[in-house]
Each structure stands twice: as C-alpha cells, then as structure tokens.
Amino acid sequence: MDELTKRVIPCLDIKGGRVVKGVQFVNLIDAGDPVSCAVAYEENKADELCFLDITASSDKRDILLHLVEEVANKLFIPFTVGGGIRTIEDVKAVLNKGADKVSINTSAFQNPKLLKDASEIYGSQCIVCAIDVKFHPERKRYEVYLNGGRAETGREALDWGKEAHEMGAGEILLTSMDKDGTKDGFDINLMKSFTSNLTIPIIASGGAGNPEHMAEVILRGGADAVLAASIFHFGEFSIQETKQTMKEMGIKVRL
C-alpha cells in the first residue's frame, strides 16, 4: 500500500484475552473472541488492526502472547499490539509471536530510550508511539496525559511528538481524550499541529462518529490513517461503507 493510500484501522480493547466492547456488526458466534473479530474485520476490508490490552499487568502477559500468536496465524493484514509494553523484552516477545508493530504509550514517555532501542533493533516501521492528549484550558495548549488519560504530565503534546519521532518512532497514534467517545468528529487543530510539523505518519483517534468525520480528519487534518472502535464494533457503519464515502470525497483507499 503506497503512502498516499489512507488506512482505516479498527481497534479492539482486550481484557484478560477477551474483547471488552463486544462486536455486534456481524453474526459472530462469540463476539468476545479476538480472533473471530479480527477475521471478520479483515473480511470487511480493514487495512490493519490494533489490539490494546487494557489490563496488561504482567500476570496477563502470557494470555496476550498466546492471543497474538493465534491472531497472527489467522490474519493476513498487519496488526499492532499495545498495552503494557514496558521493556525491550516485551517488544521482542510480541513481535516474535507475529505482531507487525508494537504501540508504546506511557513507557515511551517515561523512558524515551525504549523507542530508540526498539527502533534500532527492529526498525522504526515496527514502532508506534501512542500519545493521549487533552487541551489544557488554563495553559491554552495541548498536553500529554498518561495511564489512559488519568495522569497529567504538563508537557506540551507536539514537543513530545517531536522527541518521539527523533527517538525512532515510525508512526504516532494520536488520541484526543477530549473527543474520545463523543462521536462528534476528530480534533482537526490537534491533528494539523502534528501533521504539519512531523514527517512520519500520524494516525487519528478519538471522535469518529461517521465516515464523513474520518474523511474530514484526512482532508483537513492531514491524517495518514484513522482508528476507530465503537462505530465499527456496533455495526453503525461498516468499514466498506466508510471507505466508499472516503473515496467519493476524493481520498485514495483500498476497496
């Protein structure tokens, strides 16, 4: 897929080896089974998939690795795994089980050298830096939040984005915590601030309510890819419908 082709990426939240927000868009026998969901999304023309292990404590790590291996055996499209990736050993384990990319969030911020080491060993194309952002009303700027948006860092978002890029991240998964779950569109200004200052691909996350929103963050925000969870999971829109809308709005997609 060339870089002009825009990607649509469903995201599955995993807890203890199960999909948390059950997927209702297709007649799955078991909507909580990540492998069934992954295969269904691939059939529906997803370009990539993202699995976020939202419990990801060390005792759950083995469940996740087993799951990664199962998904890798069934899936042909690339998939990213994130959640609880804290060390270079975690990166190695997930990639060795067949994931195409790893997404690192809190640990990258706390230890940027992890991005550097991981990208030097495995190549920056495997390393996604996930950044959760909120607009700080007093300071009137976008800032980085950790631990699923619960911990304030006080660091300006683009400043961290630039460092993550310099450290070797090959992509940034940029989530607006303000927009997340609202379904009223992406934060275009946030996206533009990243896409106009960085040369690596930026994946937009947080706010998707319909296919037009996804087209808008690409056309107006410069996003390289869009990530969404609930609008796909609950069958409000299919990936194929979304891509058709994007194509009609002049965006190059893989149908």
Curated annotation (Swiss-Prot):
It is an enzyme of class 4 (lyase). GO terms for cellular component: cytoplasm. Pathway: Amino-acid biosynthesis; L-histidine biosynthesis; L-histidine from 5-phospho-alpha-D-ribose 1-diphosphate: step 5/9. One of its GO terms (biological process) is L-histidine biosynthetic process. CDD domains: HisF. Signal peptide: none annotated. Keywords: Amino-acid biosynthesis, Cytoplasm, Histidine biosynthesis, Lyase. Its main location: cytoplasm. One of its GO terms (molecular function) is lyase activity. The keyword Lyase applies. The keyword Isomerase does not apply. It is found in: Cytoplasm. It catalyses: 5-[(5-phospho-1-deoxy-D-ribulos-1-ylimino)methylamino]-1-(5-phospho-beta-D-ribosyl)imidazole-4-carboxamide + L-glutamine = D-erythro-1-(imidazol-4-yl)glycerol 3-phosphate + 5-amino-1-(5-phospho-beta-D-ribosyl)imidazole-4-carboxamide + L-glutamate + H(+). Its EC number is 4.3.2.10. Pfam families: His_biosynth. SUPFAM superfamilies: Ribulose-phoshate binding barrel. HAMAP family: HisF. IGPS catalyzes the conversion of PRFAR and glutamine to IGP, AICAR and glutamate. The HisF subunit catalyzes the cyclization activity that produces IGP and AICAR from PRFAR using the ammonia provided by the HisH subunit. Belongs to the HisA/HisF family. Heterodimer of HisH and HisF. This is Imidazole glycerol phosphate synthase subunit HisF.
